[in-house]
């Protein structure tokens, strides 16, 4: 069993006189870039990330199985322009299962593998101010079968 949890708190910090130069050479106040003012998170930074991996290895029979859960809290996907709010994305909870079995015969081996990804088939969602949908779609689940023969 392996797991990790990362909690962060991020913010954008700028001074009253901080500016940036746009592609036309104009000086623009940093304060005008953030509709939420100083109380805004870094773009792409989740406050909480968690991963759990439960694995099983049977060395005598050449079998491995792993169950994986990945969680990422909501985060700023894109900054709002002028008075528009930031686009906040809610990444889906991802649950995967991976199994492999290696069969030995004389000097050869056959490895069979099965991967089941995104078992919950949750949808990806991003919105402005929780009401204007920016992106919404299902990621879809996937199944992979693998065969590897060594001689």
Model region roles, listed by residue range:
Residues 1-79:
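Gram-negative outer-membrane beta-barrel transporters
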Residues 16-18, 46, 91, 123-124, ...:
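Solvent-exposed, flexible loop/coil residues
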Residues 35-41, 82-87, 130-135:
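Extracellular loop and loop/strand-boundary signature of outer-membrane beta-barrel proteins
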Residues 46-50, 91-95, 139-143:
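Residues that define the transmembrane beta-barrel architecture of outer-membrane proteins
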Residues 52-54, 65, 97-99, 145-147:
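Membrane-embedded beta-strands of outer-membrane beta-barrel proteins
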Residues 60, 70-79, 101-151:
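C-terminal beta-signal and adjacent terminal beta-strands/loops
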Residues 86-94, 104:
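Short, well-ordered coil↔helix boundary/capping segments
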């Amino acid at each position: 069993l392996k797991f990790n949890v990362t909690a962060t708190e991020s913010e954008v910090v700028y001074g009253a006189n901080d500016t940036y130069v746009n592609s036309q050479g104009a000086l623009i106040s940093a304060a005008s870039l953030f509709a939420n003012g100083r109380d805004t998170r870094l773009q792409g930074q989740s406050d909480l990330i968690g991963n759990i991996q439960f694995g099983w290895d049977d060395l005598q029979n050449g079998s491995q199985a792993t169950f994986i859960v990945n969680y990422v809290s909501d985060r700023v996907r894109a900054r709002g322009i002028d008075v528009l709010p930031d686009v906040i994305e809610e990444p889906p909870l991802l649950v995967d299962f991976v199994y492999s079995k290696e069969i030995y015969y004389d000097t050869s081996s056959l490895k069979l593998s099965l991967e089941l990804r995104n078992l919950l088939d949750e949808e990806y969602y991003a919105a402005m101010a929780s009401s204007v949908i920016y992106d919404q779609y299902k990621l879809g689940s996937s199944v992979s079968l693998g065969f590897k023969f060594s001689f």
